[in-house]
Design a protein with these regions (language model features):
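Transmembrane alpha-helical core residues of multi-pass small-molecule transporters
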Residues: 13, 42-46, 108-112, 130-134, ...
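Short helical (or helix-break) motifs at transmembrane helix termini and adjacent helical loops
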Residues: 176-183
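Hydrophobic alpha-helical segments and their helix-loop junctions in multi-pass secondary transporters
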Residues: 78-103, 111-123, 127-159, 167, ...
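Membrane-interface helix-loop-helix modules in multi-pass membrane proteins
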Residues: 1-62, 185-216
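Small-residue-rich segments of transmembrane alpha-helices in multi-pass membrane proteins
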Residues: 6-11, 67-79, 131-146, 199-208
């Protein structure tokens, strides 16, 4: 069970990218609760579906060896890294001047890249675990500090907002197939339960995101 939780945390953090915190709040605040629930449910079910299809042999890892697929997945990984470094830089701007925050973010990005290049998947999973714990603790503390502050209820979703939620759900359910991180983690998921644990972790994470979205 501990192995599933350990790997599941890594899967959830890998799936979060770094943009889901801000994006989730924006969806709840602008598109309403119904659209947020569709988007959030799709995010969680995507992890369950991918794990189920992989372990039932419906997904063939050999497809990743195709040159076109390999180029595409590498581009996605670079894109994810850029997004995460951008989020880190914006966070550091709250504490340092622009040049210092840029240098710190670049240095941390280079260090983690070299660490994962040397240690491989094990290092990536280990760093994900600490990111996950810090994220949940941080969001929980922020939610606690909001107790007693008047909240702003989410607007009611319009038909177009719900349509957007359904469209995004379709994209999410298929988009995970192009992310090589999850293929790598599925390969070492000996218990075949890590993706289910990841969906629960991600649901808790998005619940905290929604709570914080009520406080602008």
């Amino acid at each position: 069970m501990l192995q599933s939780l350990y790997l599941g945390t890594s899967i959830a953090i890998s799936w979060a990218w770094g943009t889901s915190l801000i994006l989730g709040m924006q969806i709840a605040q602008t598109k309403g609760l119904e659209a947020f629930l569709i988007w959030a449910t799709a995010n969680c079910l995507t992890l369950v579906l991918f794990g189920f299809l992989y372990h039932r042999k419906f997904l063939n890892p050999l497809v990743l060896d195709q040159p076109v697929v390999r180029v595409f997945t590498n581009l996605i990984q670079i894109f994810c890294l850029i997004i995460q470094l951008k989020i880190l830089n914006e966070t550091l701007l709250n504490f340092f001047d622009p040049i210092s925050s840029y240098l710190i973010a670049s240095g941390m990005g280079l260090f983690l890249t070299l660490l994962m290049f040397q240690k491989g998947l094990k290092a990536s999973i280990f760093t994900d675990l600490w990111q996950g714990l810090l994220t949940i603790v941080g969001l929980s503390m922020m939610a606690y500090l909001c107790i007693g502050i008047p909240s702003n209820p989410s607007p009611t979703s319009s038909v177009s907002d719900i349509s957007w939620g359904i469209w995004s759900a379709v994209i999410l359910l298929s988009g995970i197939m192009t992310d090589i991180q999850h293929w790598q983690r599925a390969k070492v998921d000996d218990t075949q339960k890590a993706f289910y644990c990841a969906s629960v972790f991600f649901a808790i994470y998005l619940s905290l995101v929604y709570v914080l979205s009520l406080y602008k």
